[in-house]
Amino acid sequence: MAPSSKSERNSGAGSGGGGPGGAGGKRAAGRRREHVLKQLERVKISGQLSPRLFRKLPPRVCVSLKNIVDEDFLYAGHIFLGFSKCGRYVLSYTSSSGDDDFSFYIYHLYWWEFNVHSKLKLVRQVRLFQDEEIYSDLYLTVCEWPSDASKVIVFGFNTRSANGMLMNMMVMSDENHRDIYISTVAVPPPGRCAACRDASRAHPGDPSAQCLRHGFMLHTKYQVVYPFPTFQPAFQLKKDQVVLLNTSYSLVACAVSVHSAGDSSFCQILYDHTTYPPAPPSPPGPQSPELPPVLPSLCPEAAPAWPSGPPDPSPAIAKAKEFVADIFRRAKEAKGGTSEEVRPPPCPGPSGSRCRLPSEPLGPGGEAVPRDSPPAAEAPAPEPGYVNYTKLYYVLGSGEGTEPEDEFEDDKISLPFVVTDLRGRNLRPMREQAVVQGQYLTVEQLTLDFEYVINEVIRHDATWGHQFCSFSDYDIVILEVCPETNQVLINIGLLLLAFPSPTEEGQLRPKTYHTSLKVAWDLNTGIFVTVSVGDLTEVKGQTSGSVWSSYRKSCVDMVMKWLVPESSGRYVNRMTNEALHKGCSLKVLADSERYTWIVL
């Protein structure tokens, strides 16, 4: 779309193509000129401001990229991705590799300060995916959290095989494996803080001299297997400061934050054993069997200090609960209450764990205390067998008081992270916060083991559990994330071997079936709750690819059917190089909130 102008409008009014007498042109113009008030009225219904509210923008808010960037940068291969959420920066990246088959790709990310009346000003350049040897061009996606503007996260997907000869010689991953590269980078601040000024004085003339809060980089890499996990940034980044990573074998919730020594406002983001306060007792009366499970947990940063009386839940909490409840109620009604058995959370959990009833008080360590037992100082509840929690503090220094790196190499569960500052200096991990001085970066990881969860759900909650033999493959899709309650609702598609139902006579050999398990995972306690278990559907003549394709389509349909539009400010900003891989280019870089375009 080109910017509109008066001459365009005049010439367009005088031409009436599209049919005899220009009738087709008039009808098209009528469709294009729908009144703005009507479009705004649709906002009330849909909850979102359509990006096509205005089909064209006036020239005064449209600038050409060639006019604001020196040609040298364009010839250097800069790929411009888009605006940051704040509208202050435009982001671009470059990739470079040698001419021979043994060269690997090097990626750099750039922040440009944008002013509609002047040229772009380069304010930061960083190298992505710290020293990884990447032998094929990557699909890149740069994302920003809904409200956390302090950092961005960059995903690199290796979806195409490298050179065939190189594959054979280097014994690289085959078609059943894909590499995922991730870098989390601090965003340049609008102004220098006191710590940044101290760093500049210590290293005069070095533009990369920044404090840790405004100058850290965190990198990791992992490999996924078929069926390759879906990329869902709208859900994976829905909770600020947290990213959910599907590694094919586990779901890893990672939280990254920067603090200063002695900071009293430090708050653990994951696995803090807090739950939502008990709801006020409901009046006596029969409860409807249609009532779906309610997810009662509340994230610590959103939980105020409750008074002694019964608290009134915030509108956001009530809306989140109502939304989740409506999903399960309608899903059960749509299925006629037969294909999936909806189970409420207050039930004995796997591995001896117990889900807290909404009316039970919370004991030490996040453990539920029955009403008839007096409160007492008990030991914290043991960590469930299906989760693993780690927290490391990364600091700059000479290494005094830090653990040897070999200590962390044996950890096969947590993702390995490399943390550096902008000057390329590695930060060293520590387990104890007490010995930290100055600024430090905290990385929390809470890992949910998929296979453990699958076995526990089948053993405790599946009505067909006695028929089950083994499962051969599974696929995980996130259906919803509630940042208010810290609940993650996931769907586990499962291919398994099971004996036929006893009603089928003469069938003594196991068959291949497909089913789905829905569980809700609490990021505060680490405990999962079985939401529903699907019936067994026999796989007859279908390939695994067609099974997973149908399964993912059903997940998309479910998500879209119950989608609640986010407010205009609470969305995950996403910029990709997808157009480049399709062999085309974006037409404009649009800042939809401030109605500004950069025409490419």
From Swiss-Prot:
Q: Does the keyword Cell inner membrane apply?
A: no
Give the compositionally biased regions (Gly residues): 13-27
Question: Where in this protein does the record say Phosphoserine is found?
Answer: S50, S314
The residues listed in the UniProt record as binding Zn(2+), with positions renumbered to this chain, are C193, C196, C211, H214
Q: Mark out the compositionally biased spans (Basic and acidic residues).
A: 333-343
Q: Does the keyword Transmembrane helix apply?
A: no
Please provide, in alphabetical order, the Gene Ontology terms of the cellular component aspect for this entry: Cul4-RING E3 ubiquitin ligase complex
UniProt cross-references to InterPro entries, sorted A to Z: DCAF15, DCAF15_C, DCAF15_WD40
Per UniProt, the ranges with Low complexity bias are 296-306
Compositional bias of kind Pro residues: 277-295
* Example of a GO biological process term: regulation of natural killer cell activation
| Key words of the record | Immunity, Metal-binding, Phosphoprotein, Ubl conjugation pathway, Zinc
The pathway noted for it is: Protein modification; protein ubiquitination
Region described as Disordered: spans on this chain: 1-30, 277-316, 333-383
> One MF term in GO for this entry?
metal ion binding
Instruction: Summarize the protein's role.
Output: Substrate-recognition component of the DCX(DCAF15) complex, a cullin-4-RING E3 ubiquitin-protein ligase complex that mediates ubiquitination and degradation of target proteins. The DCX(DCAF15) complex acts as a regulator of the natural killer (NK) cells effector functions, possibly by mediating ubiquitination and degradation of cohesin subunits SMC1A and SMC3. May play a role in the activation of antigen-presenting cells (APC) and their interaction with NK cells.
Q: How does it assemble?
A: Component of the DCX(DCAF15) complex, also named CLR4(DCAF15) complex, composed of DCAF15, DDB1, cullin-4 (CUL4A or CUL4B), DDA1 and RBX1.
- The protein, known as: DDB1- and CUL4-associated factor 15
What organism does the record attribute this protein to?
Bos taurus (Bovine)
